[in-house]
């Protein structure tokens, strides 16, 4: 893995969140550096998805700060928020593809929203990214219902990357994929990171992904940050202090991770 830059791109400070009377987070703090692949782990209901949503303006925290590129996103005006998120790509768990659009049209959606590109340029950039994520030219004119789960994930990545983001947010990127496809997806993430110095934040239950392509991960439990470090740190803490890691994951992939233990 490439060396991680010292520049902090994301900083979460003392984040609290709740739904009604149900407390989700109680003072979560961490940072993400440029060029780092960081994962958010935790058991079902631990607040992984809510944390990600707080980081991408979908859930407002009840307290605390979320800084992207040094700006507290929840204190910015809408126009300034948009400028920040023009530098980010987001790929949701099921791709969130438009069913009435072809692969080529889906990938070009964000470029068209920028309004600064001609139709020809949008098409050329879209084709480039479709091929970069490992899909053949014959996929250009397919519709989402004609794609496998793995292909949909790759289209989602192509669309998120088409605007050349500095940060990529991923929600369960290998969920629903067979082991081979999940492994190839991990390779894609590493290729993007190494070739573009991309910073990636992902929610995952996939322990092989953690082993293969994650530089560091945080672990949520009972609304708190239970762990923040790399795999070596995790192994050391599990052996010396004990961690309830066995109950945190439901993925069938994890052989490499557990061998490390």
Protein language model features and the residues they cover:
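Conserved catalytic motifs of ABC-family nucleotide-binding domains
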Residues: 164
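Conserved ABC ATPase "signature" region
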Residues: 120-138
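Conserved ABC ATPase signature
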Residues: 143-147, 151
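H-loop/switch region of ABC-family ATPase nucleotide-binding domains
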Residues: 204-205
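Catalytic Walker B motif of ABC-type/P-loop ATPase nucleotide-binding domains
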Residues: 168-171
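Helix-to-loop junction immediately C-terminal to a conserved catalytic motif
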Residues: 56
């Amino acid at each position: 893995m490439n060396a991680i830059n010292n520049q902090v791109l994301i900083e979460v400070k003392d984040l609290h969140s709740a739904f009604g009377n149900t407390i989700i987070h109680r003072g979560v703090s961490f940072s993400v550096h440029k060029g780092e692949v960081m994962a958010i782990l935790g058991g079902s209901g631990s607040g992984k998805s809510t944390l990600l949503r707080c980081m991408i303006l979908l859930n407002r925290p009840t307290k605390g700060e979320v800084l992207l590129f040094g700006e507290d996103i929840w204190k910015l005006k809408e126009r300034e928020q948009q400028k920040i998120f023009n530098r980010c790509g987001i790929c949701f768990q099921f791709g969130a593809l438009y069913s009435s659009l072809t692969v080529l049209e889906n990938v070009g959606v964000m470029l068209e929203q920028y309004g600064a590109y001609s139709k020809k340029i949008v098409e050329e950039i879209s084709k480039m990214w479709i091929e970069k994520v490992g899909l053949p030219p014959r996929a250009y004119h397919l519709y989402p219902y004609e794609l496998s789960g793995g292909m949909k994930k790759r289209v989602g990545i192509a669309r998120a990357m088409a605007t050349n983001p500095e940060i990529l947010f991923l929600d369960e990127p290998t969920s629903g994929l067979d082991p081979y496809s999940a492994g190839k997806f991990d390779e894609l993430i590493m290729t993007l990171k190494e070739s573009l110095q991309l910073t990636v934040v992902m929610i995952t239950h996939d322990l092989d992904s953690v082993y293969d392509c994650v530089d560091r991960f945080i672990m949520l439990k009972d609304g708190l940050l239970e762990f923040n470090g790399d795999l070596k740190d995790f192994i050391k803490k599990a052996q010396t202090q004990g961690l309830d890691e066995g109950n945190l994951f439901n993925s069938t992939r994890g052989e490499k991770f557990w061998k490390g233990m």
